[in-house]
């Protein structure tokens, strides 16, 4: 989009290296393509190499500089190998965006409230699968911690070095049905604050973005029926969002650019910034 491109082009990150995990996903692929307009080099890390490589090709065809790397963010040795490959191609990390994350159906309940007369086939809290819960916590929390261990070492003392984690409005108040995801994102917010303090003497800032409900291909069926009308859950969301609408990926870009550009946020550290239309601020009354 021309509008978002112009926003990104206002930030000059030339000769900086931005490393993005989960870069093949819907959200991070969009952000990566926009960040390329800052003139930064972009390293795209994802377990799905084909998805990340597609993004890299789009960036390069548009005049940017990017390369994809097949990466398992839960395998420390693999991350270290990728780090060495990136150093050969671009140098060392200046800005790390920990975008890998997600939920799992095995860690999700069917019901919002437990009741005495539930159907036997209903997946309740008591039916949540241990492996599904572990998957969600590992992917979201360890999937941010391990890349930070590897790449932050190269960022020590660098001018403008910073880390961005992707939290969620779930971190403030958990949503129904997704206890593991809500808990994992709360851990990300806590980890963000911990990192901000830990690295405060060596020049690395750490902040997080907490997206609200954004419309994407991944959640389209959850939010709208086949006729394009909001589902019951979507109506609940809209009722509890003071701005009365869903967000779009483009609306995260301004928050991200603000946090990563030290010309705008050099004294901003340890912040979890909601981009949710007021959802996390509203009590419902």
From Swiss-Prot:
What InterPro entries does this protein map onto?
NAD(P)-bd_dom_sf, Sc_DH/Rdtase_CS, SDR_fam
Determine if NAD is one of this entry's keywords: yes
Which keywords annotate this record? NAD, Oxidoreductase
Q: List the Gene3D superfamilies.
A: NAD(P)-binding Rossmann-like Domain (3.40.50.720)
Q: Active site annotated at which positions?
A: 181
Pfam families xref list: adh_short
Q: Which NCBIfam families match?
A: PRK08277.1
Q: Which family does it belong to?
A: Belongs to the short-chain dehydrogenases/reductases (SDR) family.
Report what the protein is called: Uncharacterized oxidoreductase HI_0048
What is the originating organism of this protein?
Haemophilus influenzae (strain ATCC 51907 / DSM 11121 / KW20 / Rd)
